[in-house]
Structures are given as C-alpha cells and as structure tokens.
Amino acid sequence: MLCRCVLASLFTRTERIYLSMYIFFMSLGCDKNLVDSEEMLGALVSRGFEVTDDESQAEVIVVNTCCFIHDAKEESIQAILDMANYKTEGNLKALIVTGCLAQRYKEEITKEIPEVDAVLGTNSQAALLDAVDEALKGKVSHVFTPLEGIPQVPGKRMITTGGFYEYLKIAEGCDNHCTYCIIPKIRGNYRSVPMETLIEQAKQLAEQGVKELILVAQETTIYGTDLYGKKSLHLLLKELCKIPGIVWIRVLYCYPEEIYPELIETIRDEKKICHYLDLPIQHASDRILKRMGRRTSKQQLVDIVSTLRKEIPDIVLRTTLITGFPGETQEDHEELMEFVDQMEFDRLGVFTYSPEEDTPAATMEDQIPEEVKQDRQAELMELQQEISLERGEKCVGKDYLVMIEGKVADENAYVGRTYADAPGIDGYMFINTGELLMSGDFVKAHVTGSLEYDLIGEIADEYTE
C-alpha cells in the first residue's frame, strides 16, 4: 500500500496512476458502443487499473449505456440501479455513467440515482480519466462535449471480443433524421474518422492478433464525404487490405441508396473483403418508407439488390426490417411479406416499432397495437426461416473457409463462421473433428448438413494465413 501511494504521488492529477485498483466495465447496446467502451478501457488500463469481471470487487464501475429502443433504455436503467447497489454492498467508490442514455437523460440520472458520481455524454469519453479522479475525491462531475468536430480516437484499445475479430468505427453521428430514430440528437451530425487514424488503429489491432476487421458506423457508405468531398469507403478498404495479418474485412450498415460503383468493384475485386453486405432497408411499402423518412422506393431497393447479385454472384445480403410502424396497414404488411419472399435475403432481422420520445413517429396517428406488431414480426421471421433453410440446403456439398471461434463443450466439435456470417447476429458452422484447433484458426470445411440458420461440416484441409 505504501508503494502504491508513493508511486501515485509522483504523477500530476491528470496522470495519476491507479495501481491494483479494480474496475468493472459494462458495455450495453450496439457494436459502435462497444468500440467506445474498448477505447475507454484501454485508457483506464494504461493508467494502471485492473479489469475485473466481478462487480462486487470493483472500486470503480463504468456503465456505457444505450437508449436506441425502449427495451435498451430499460436495460440501461436497470444496469445503473444494479451497479449503484455496490456502493453499500461492495467496494464501489465511483460509479460513472456514459453513452446514449447519459447523453439523453443526464438531469434525470443525476436526480433519480444519487449514487452516480459522473455522467459523461457520447462525445466526452476523453474526459473519463478526469471524471474518475474527481469521483474518487468525492466530487460529482458532468461532462458533455458538443456533438461536433472530428471524432477523437484515443490510444490502444482493450480487445474484448475474444481477440480475433474487432469492430472498426469509421464515423460518428448521422445526418439522415429518420422519423423513428433519436440517434442524430444524441450522437450529432455525421463525422468521419480520418483515414490515417483508422489505418493506424487497424494496424494496432492486427499486431494484437486480430484477423477480421468489421467496419461500422451509423452509415458506412458515405464515409469521407465530410472530410474529402466524396465517398471514400472504397479507398479506405483498399488501404486496409494492405495490412499484414488481416484475413477478412467485413462492412456493416450500408445504406442501399448510397452504394456506388467503385465500392461494388472494390468489394468484388479485393480478396480480403468478405462478399457480404448489411443493408438496413426497414420496409418495402413506398408509403411507409416515406413516413419513415427513408430515401428509397421499393423498386430502387429491388434494383440495388439485383445489381449487387449480378456484380458479385456469391454476395451474402443481410437486412433489418421494422414492423408495426405507425400507419402500417395489413396491405403494407402483406407487401413487405411479398418483398421478402421475392428478394430472399440471406440474413434478415425484424424489430417491432418502438416509439421514442422527441421523434416525429412517436406522435404520428394510427399507432399499431403491440400484439399486432408481434404477430407481424412472427410472420416475417417464419417466412425468413423457410428461406434460410432452403439457402442452407444449397450449401451442402460445398467447401468454405471458416474462422474457428471455440470448441463445443464435451464434444469433438468446434464452432466457426464463414464469410457469410457476421459475429453475434448471424449463424455458425459446427465442425466435427478430432483435430486440435484454436480460436482464430482458419480451416477449410466441407458442408455435410444444414439447420435453419447454421451449417454442419467437417475438415476438408487446414488453411493457414
């Protein structure tokens, strides 16, 4: 203890080192939030904090919150309340709340949960260390940096995904202002991260053993328009492909209307880029798309999907839909069902509409009963289940490169992913083998069977990058 105090006294307030002080970090919400969490964790670890997975042991707890939909908001509030209990039941000295819920409800959090020592906005992660300093001195702080300017990317991140895939957040904020979405108000306008910053961060991740980069943002397709005056995602991708050690590069959150020829060509021609795109289309009824504030028509969506499949025949397309949006009639729902049946997306998720305060959609007339929303969601997912099963059956007999993620307990089998599957949201391939494999290995696997969303296979031959 004496050594710890003496060493800490050698540093100024903004450089204080916390030797052997435990921190528990809870990251809620999307993969973009996870990137923020890993950046904050990296800063804390560099200052001497030791990360623990036992919240009762922690002297500092940080909750990075989400409030995108009602359920996420409730989860975040409950998480803060649960962590606040450790002020009396554990070792907790400082409780820090950050993220989207903190940005949106800073006054309410401070008033209703007095155990919270600091509230940081979505653009204030750089202030975390100072906030911890103040909290450990018994001082309450609130930091809300304006939602503008080039996103600041701090030093080395702490990888929490297992070490072999990582998300690379290429932009912050959003300019779309869809009528159901609060993100522009809590994340600000669209701001690209400079290309050289992203390349340096990607190199650091590769040096730490990362083999798959997954590019994320509220919208990836317009990357660079604010910095370079033109869409530059294809240029960023080409630079990332040059990094040694990276085997796969995957792109999520591509708004369909912003996909452009150079991007398609780059995805098609660069060997490291997975032939996989995530296209959040939300609906197919022109009337509902207009009410949502989307910028595409159903025919444009059909044309975009057709172009992608023509130019990249083995491309895997994922999309997300919202059902039960205000004013959605049974005819609108049936039109969406027909569209899904026609398009046969490889991967598809469906959310029921969640009214968010301070959004235009929340005050629209003709709100849909929750039971109807859930029924429509179930119908869409039942249809997609049939499509997925048929597509899986077509994979039987083919060989795929697979990244191993782990071993099935008590069985001679491993779990992995093909290029067609993004982590956490898509399916897996279960590989039966007596060979010893490690997480992060790449193997060539032969598909012997299929399930509704997953594949079954065996080793064809090992692949080493």
What are these regions (language model features)?
Residues 67-68, 187-188, 227-230, 290-296, ...:
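Short glycine-enriched, charge-decorated loop/helix-capping segments at active-site entrances
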Residues 363-465:
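Terminal RNA-binding accessory module
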